[in-house]
Regions:
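A short, solvent-exposed beta-edge/loop patch
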Residues: 48, 154-192, 402
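Ordered core of a single globular domain
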Residues: 360-367, 373-376, 382
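Structural boundary/hinge residues at secondary-structure and domain interfaces
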Residues: 2-7, 11-156, 198-243, 260-360
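Charged, amphipathic alpha-helical scaffolding segments
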Residues: 164-185, 254-266, 270-276, 289
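Helix N-cap motif at beta-to-alpha junctions
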Residues: 119-124, 178-183, 369-373
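A common structural junction motif
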Residues: 132-142, 193-194, 383-392
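Generic beta-strand structural signal
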Residues: 144-149, 166-170, 254, 357-358, ...
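C-terminal soluble interaction/assembly domains
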Residues: 389-402
Length: 402
């Protein structure tokens, strides 16, 4: 009996030891996005996450979509990093299968810098980077780098004629960029127990997703200042005013980059127009079927509860200081035409509307209606008609308050 007890205890201890060693050597960031996010500076507006696996690269090989978004030069630089570092025979086994995070940051000089953050396996030794320079014909020069309290290296990549700065963080997580200033920001990150400034996908969603994108809308404004000459950024204008976070999964499609997921809106911040849709439920979009063939880009919006949306819109006008002007306009229309336009108009509205810009820079608005004939009769009272089906509104700001 004692012999069996001793054997059982030995087996239990061996099992416990193997379990501890196993989980110690598991790479935590691969299944813990939050830990990696803590190593990314808070001024990141967008983070793109994907798995460093050959299948991901095979799917998008030769596809022009990413180049259309990032530009061929930037995509070419990232691809060179992949080939010369992640797929290098000295490094590949330590980074294969790990999730790569590419974050977008504005710089002091009104430029955009990318930060690449990814974990290495627990058995990776940073000294292996020094061996890269000894590989014949790889065109990489390695020199030590000290960024704050963090150690790393500078990789001069001959194929790009550029330096790539790399530092080691906790838990064998590495951060690298062509911008030395951005790497220095990484070195200054203070560790806290607070959550990263991004909404995250669940572990299951993250594991099943081909790629993910995380958006911090509060940081889009400084990013757009680097991209656009003015703040009237058309379809992006509402996003500049939105306070919230999105965690989205990539849906594979050969001719489009499509993401779906959830957005968390910060209710105590400044309310933008998009906040009005926070309590609406998804509905089928049908207006897209009648978009003109010359459409360059569009914004489609829909509501599931028109009564609730109308109330939210009215409250938004009040907070924005437009309520008085709205009341004066509709009172004027009532006095001049005898038409209670607001009440009758809302009763005829459908639940979809869209704004379209064509490749000729024409702007069109499309609104779904419950009864087009009745709406046409109603609008005749407040318009200068050119024929029975078209005309110009007699009150300039009327579309704004619709």
């Amino acid at each position: 009996m004692r012999k069996h007890l001793i054997i059982t205890l030995i087996l239990l201890l061996a099992t416990a030891y193997i379990t501890v060693v196993y989980f110690k050597n598991l790479n935590p960031p691969g299944s813990n996005t939050s830990r990696v996010m803590h190593e990314i500076p808070g001024n990141a507006s967008v983070i793109f996450e994907f798995n460093n696996d050959s299948s991901f690269y095979d799917i998008f090989k030769g596809n022009p979509l990413f180049a259309a978004v990032t530009g061929r030069q930037i995509l070419g630089q990232l691809d060179t990093l992949r080939q010369q570092l992640l797929q290098n025979k000295l490094l590949s086994k330590y980074f294969s299968g790990q999730n790569v995070f590419i974050s977008v940051h504005p710089t002091q000089t009104k430029n955009i810098a990318l930060l690449v953050t990814l974990p290495a396996s627990a058995d990776f030794d940073p000294a292996i980077f020094d061996q890269l320079a000894k590989q014949p014909g790889n065109g990489i020069l390695v020199t030590p780098l000290q960024a704050g309290a963090k150690h790393g290296c500078t990789l001069y990549i001959n194929a790009l004629k550029k330096r790539f700065y790399l530092v080691k963080n906790e838990f064998n997580i590495y951060s690298g960029s062509f911008s030395k200033d951005l790497v220095n920001e990484v070195a200054l990150i203070k560790k806290t127990d607070s959550a990263p400034s991004f909404a995250l996908l669940s572990e299951q969603q993250n594991a099943n997703s081909l790629a993910s994108i995380y958006v911090n809308y509060s940081e889009l404004d400084p990013l757009f200042d680097c991209i656009f000459r003015n703040k009237n950024t058309d379809i992006f204008k509402s996003f500049r005013l939105l306070s919230g976070h999105s965690a989205l999964s990539l849906n594979y499609k050969t001719d489009a980059l499509m993401f779906n997921g959830e957005t968390t809106v910060q209710v105590n911040e400044t309310i933008s127009y998009l906040n009005l849709f926070a309590n609406q439920q998804p509905v089928n979009n049908q207006l897209k079927d009648i978009f003109p063939s010359t459409t360059a880009y569009s914004t489609s919006l829909a509501v599931s509860n028109q009564v609730s949306f109308s109330k939210s819109l009215s409250d938004w006008y009040t907070k924005a200081g437009y309520k008085k002007e709205e009341g004066q306009l509709f009172n004027k229309i009532q006095a001049e035409t005898g038409t209670d336009l607001k009440k009758r108009f809302y009763a005829l509205l459908g639940n979809e509307f869209a704004i379209i810009t064509t490749r000729y820079f024409e702007k069109l608005a499309i609104i779904s209606l419950k009864d087009g004939s009745k709406m046409n009769t109603l609008l005749m009272n407040v318009s200068k008609m050119t024929d029975e089906n078209s005309g110009q509104l007699s009150y300039d700001k009327l579309p704004f308050f619709y």
